[in-house]
Amino acid sequence: MVAFTPEEVRNLMGKPSNVRNMSVIAHVDHGKSTLTDSLVQKAGIISAAKAGDARFMDTRADEQERGVTIKSTAISLFAEMTDDDMKDMKEPADGTDFLVNLIDSPGHVDFSSEVTAALRVTDGALVVVDTIEGVCVQTETVLRQALGERIRPVVVVNKVDRALLELQISQEELYQNFARVVESVNVVISTYYDKVLGDCQVFPDKGTVAFASGLHGWAFTVRQFANRYAKKFGIDRNKMMQRLWGENYFNPKTKKWSKSATDANGNSNQRAFNMFILDPIYRIFDAVMNSRKDEVFTLLSKLEVTIKPDEKELEGKALLKVVMRKFLPAADALMEMIVLHLPSPKTAQQYRAETLYEGPMDDECAVGIRNCDANAPLMIYVSKMVPTSDRGRFYAFGRVFSGTVRSGLKVRIQGPNYVPGKKDDLFIKAIQRTVLMMGSRIEPIEDCPAGNIIGLVGVDQFLVKSGTLTTSEVAHNMKVMKFSVSPVVQVAVEVKNGNDLPKLVEGLKRLSKSDPCVLCTTSESGEHIVAGAGELHLEICLKDLQEDHAGIPLKISPPVVSYRESVSEPSSMTALSKSPNKHNRIFMTAEPMSEELSVAIETGHVNPRDDFKVRARIMADEFGWDVTDARKIWCFGPDTTGANVVVDQTKAVAYLNEIKDSVVAAFAWASKEGPMFEENLRSCRFNILDVVLHADAIHRGGGQIIPTARRVVYASTLLASPIIQEPVFLVEIQVSENAMGGIYSVLNKKRGHVFSEEQRVGTPLYNIKAYLPVNESFGFTGELRQATAGQAFPQLVFDHWSPMSGDPLDPTSKPGQIVCEARKRKGLKENVPDYTEYYDRL
């Protein structure tokens, strides 16, 4: 069945147990888009000849040029299973037709926020791993993201053709290679074991691992071969599957199975995987590549594969492609694995509801989500915005978790800051149209029931990046997505021609809509600042801004890194500030927090929204806090979730609760703009020791308390030997031995240091991991390629904040220079103010 109509899609959408929502995730350049091609080609959207190099899902021109996926794209495919396959289904299904909603996501680490957006709306993931390179840093990151969202993985070991043609390794070596890759994936999976999700490990003999060559368009699972042999020898398929992987050997002479490589008489047995699966493949490769055509055709007739007369004329790799594609079509193997081993929305939403929904688990929305019920109140999570062909408008791309969405329906559009019962961040508007996403095209569709992925027209003006759409008045939001990267590289953008300013402002709004991880801000001096996850991410964002969103020439400053201000020891004396009317006093000290706790707050392990008793317990047990202190945390900052806290250590202060709001507001302000150069504070703990307040309420209003609290935060920070923290990238480089020297010289020049290097077993490649300050990372990729003659490919991921040595208050030191430059750029006074500016005498 080739081109299927929206009506047929609509029919399948109504059977949630026959829908599969899945994303394709992997390390950069392991072949996601190429593999996706085979699946798309099965659905008849591109021709078989093009599959493997069309990269249909890379819809943008710059994606085709660079050969790297930038945005995640969705497409709906149709799969038919045979009755025989249906017997192995883990869950009940309705008929043999399946709808697979597939999202191809980028692998490059700068775009991992796109991956997060894709994972949120899917229930299963196809993890692609390169046979030769194995599990890399980004494979691990995306797997961790997937398991954190409770998404079930299946694995494809890709690029098998490279192992056969380039490395020419023996069958046993190839088996060992596969076994190693599968094992290292399982190690990552078992690290993030989740009781509710159960065991997610993958095994070739269970059918959850496929071996493929995306470029040549062929793939197989152990199950497919077991099927073949089960028919031939008349034995049970599932028994055969277990025999075809692991330590199972077969002796062709005696026709006996054994568990060891040699039998009692010393005859050697052959590993079943090598003999029954790899042998036919090796033979075909051998015969085709050494152009022994007659041998090829006898092999094909034995394997019951027929090819067309005109295809018999082909030579070399072209013939190999055709033969392997006919023998082991990639789409069949992958579709079978997706349908049999990934959960349907009906199953998945039962265990994902609690990680998706913020409200109580027994209100009507939560129940609707859990049952994936098309008649419940509508709940849609919009995970990102997709630009339309019509300039400046966006489709909202998301998933219906419960209810049914149709054109013209009035919905409540809740942004990420919406609180039930309040009116902030809430719009009530009608949806203009609902559409199906098909790669670069869209198909209009009447309505869309729970469990499906959908595009909406007409809500883009009311949402920035993501949000919840619902028809229920009591609905809470769906949880906000946690991104694994943070925007640390910023540039200032100006227009060349003053009249274009409104266009720039409008363009920045659109840019921040279209990319989940970009941050556009306006500083107090009126600069427009764009922040991104890394050099490549920023480059693409600015290109989009100039060409699509704003459409005007821009002046772009050299990139600037964002720093954090922190303290290195407790305040040398207690800081005191008096209010402007001299009637109120606040006493405070600052001290550093442990790095572990700061990271725990940033990753959400210690959460400001948790119950304070639970949180206090965690902080006391894991981070050695005093329980009473941990219970009396007033707030986190900046943005109520940052890694700084205010602790109330006062004893018996009258009217204290009345000023709590003012202090929290002041702290939010102070922690966003630190005293040294107006960067965010990080990992500081502020203790309020004592507060003296005026008895008369009119003399202790917000106007008196807020400036005072802010000054006392600044004073206590400057008294606690302040330091600055710079962001550090984790660099992973894969390189052959002869280019190692070049890497070390480039890293040493840029203040980087290598902390691990290991050789990949069975290959001449080394894996090098190093830390590199973000400040030094500009142009790093280019220099590295020069030094290693283009052999090394670095992956840079933001890893942690590291304190810089040197006193930032001394203008001659390195941190001091950074502070001075930043102050000049922001239009502040040259020198850092002394603590006495904020400190009042008793």
UniProtKB/Swiss-Prot annotation:
Key word Transmembrane helix present: no
UniProt entry tagged with the keyword Acetylation: no
GO cellular component: cytoplasm; cytosol; ribonucleoprotein complex
Membrane-spanning intervals of the chain: none
InterPro entries for the chain: EFG_II, EFG_III/V, EFG_V-like, EFTu-like_2, G_TR_CS, P-loop_NTPase, Ribosomal_Su5_D2-typ_SF, Ribsml_uS5_D2-typ_fold_subgr
Pfam families: EFG_C, EFG_III, EFG_IV, GTP_EFTU, GTP_EFTU_D2
Record family assignment: Belongs to the TRAFAC class translation factor GTPase superfamily. Classic translation factor GTPase family. EF-G/EF-2 subfamily.
Main function: Catalyzes the GTP-dependent ribosomal translocation step during translation elongation. During this step, the ribosome changes from the pre-translocational (PRE) to the post-translocational (POST) state as the newly formed A-site-bound peptidyl-tRNA and P-site-bound deacylated tRNA move to the P and E sites, respectively. Catalyzes the coordinated movement of the two tRNA molecules, the mRNA and conformational changes in the ribosome.
Entry protein name: Elongation factor 2
Gene: eft201
